[in-house]
Amino acid sequence: SVMWMTTFKLYDYQEKLVDQARHILLNKSGVLIQSPPGSGKSVMIAEVVKNAVNKGNHILFIVHRKELSHQIKNTLTKHDVDLSQVDILSEKRAKNIMHKLTPPKIIVTDETHRSRAKTYKDIYDYFPNALRVGFTATPWRANSKGFTDIYDEMVKGPSVEWLINNNKLADYDYKSVVLADESKLKK
């Protein structure tokens, strides 16, 4: 089963989004998580990947720019993800070497772009049993052609206004530094 457990502290709204996505994937194969910049997307991504990997699953992680793969590796390493279970590739590269990849249990796409829907679809069609989880900060219309080709449902995070009003506009690195310092104080 794909159930993944929360291992590090997510904000309530982040946990809710991840839970909604998890729930959809019990019956469907693709979900897009749409959440604005500053909502702590990297934490949610790390959560999804870590829990899948902890169950022995392989992940294909698609980034839309090669430079981002370094950033993603850092995020995952920081959350103790076993990187030997994760292939981090641009969609072009993934498409070119699909036949060499370990078939993934989940394909995670960061910054899912409509313009690349065709390439994604080629990859998804090659791995028909893989679940698809996309993350984007850009609103998509759930009934648009590009969307329905790739995903079954969309879950939406809070608005930027809500994040600001609730003091939750996350700069995750800052938050983790603060938490680390607090733990030293307790000793």
Predicted regions and their residues:
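Conserved pre-motif I regulatory segment
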Residues: 4-32
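Walker A/P-loop
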Residues: 28-47
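Conserved Walker A/P-loop ATP-binding site and its immediately adjacent core
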Residues: 44, 57-75
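Post-DEXD/H (motif II) to motif III coupling segment of the RecA-like Helicase ATP-binding lobe
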Residues: 117-170
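Walker A/P-loop NTP-binding motif
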Residues: 22-23, 42-55
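Inter-Walker segment of RecA-like/P-loop motor cores
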Residues: 70-71, 76-103
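Loop/turn-to-beta-strand initiation segments
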Residues: 58, 104-106, 129-133
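Walker B catalytic acidic pair
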Residues: 110-111
